[in-house]
Amino acid sequence: MVGKDCVAIACDLRLGMQALTISNNFPKIFQYGDVFLGLTGLATDVATVSDLFRYKVNMYRLREERNISPQTMANLVSSSLYEKRFGPYFVSPVIAGINQTTGKPFICGFDSIGCIDFAKDFIVSGTASDQLFGTCEGLWEPDLVCPNCRIVMLGRILTRTAGPRGPLRDHFTGAAERYRPRRTIRLGSTCLHY
């Protein structure tokens, strides 16, 4: 989600299939310098693609002697996925970052063969993307400042699916699990658990 001079990216940590939960600590967002890459899809391909881009970004940093920009990372992801178009990775990447030269936020998404979907407001990906589009359209506002962008991402979206101490129910995909907040943020009278 894009705000005014800021960007926020969020995901769940659940690894599973329908009602079967394998892990509650599976990373899906990876940081490459100042750029964040979110990967949804097949777990083995998520691990493979994240390692592949870690290697390519490190090679870029050594060759160019600077960190990769979000736009360059988008082109790298697109060309790398297109190389494997006849045997694609089953992932749907999302890139979020701030261009260090212009200071402008940048987000984009991809399909499994590298077609770039640029956006100026928000990008969603994964099994619940159809439902998340409606939720994000209702909650996104132009020119959100940085703390408000995080509040929208964490507070509004997550509190609509979780009670304060009850079970966390993923209304979009139908998986239920016990809700245990990992961190609590107090903002005035509002308390956010995530």
Locations of regions flagged by a protein language model:
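Long, low-complexity N-terminal extensions
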Residues: 1-194
